[in-house]
UniProtKB/Swiss-Prot annotation:
One of its GO terms (cellular component) is cytoplasm. S-adenosyl-L-methionine binds at residues 68, 95, 114-119. The lineage of its organism: Bacteria, Pseudomonadati, Nitrospirota, Thermodesulfovibrionia, Thermodesulfovibrionales. It comes from Thermodesulfovibrio yellowstonii (strain ATCC 51303 / DSM 11347 / YP87). GO terms for molecular function: rRNA (pseudouridine-N3-)-methyltransferase activity. This is Ribosomal RNA large subunit methyltransferase H. Its EC number is 2.1.1.177. The gene is rlmH. Keywords: Cytoplasm, Methyltransferase, rRNA processing, S-adenosyl-L-methionine, Transferase.
Amino acid sequence: MYRFKIYYPGKTKAKFIKEGIDHYIKLLSPFAKVELIELKEGHGDKEKVTEEESKTILNSLKGDFILLHRDGKSLSSTEFADFIKDKSLTQFVIGGVYGVNEAVFKAASFRLSLSSLTFTHEISRLLLLEQLYRAITIIHGKSYHY
């Protein structure tokens, strides 16, 4: 059984995103345990928020983690499946509204880009879960990825 931990600051506010997240967690449940770790959202100006949230992220993590970041490496869905298939625990970090600081960027064992497009941090949560489900179906030979 795979384990995925996804760390992010702030609540998921949009109802349709919450529903999508719940949908993919349910689809993943026969194959993986998914933990969403909602961290405290920072307050203040951009710099203060980024520093607060980044400190909270680093203090919450144990071990290696993958940072979702626009400057990360792009992988195809099959490459992503190969990347996670031998890991029992995979931890992901999604930054808040302003992203993360340099310390989080450097501490990441891998930086993954979901796209060269920019997405909100809430949409990124949903997209990551969809890609995790797609990867699991590729690994298990299920008909979802064509």
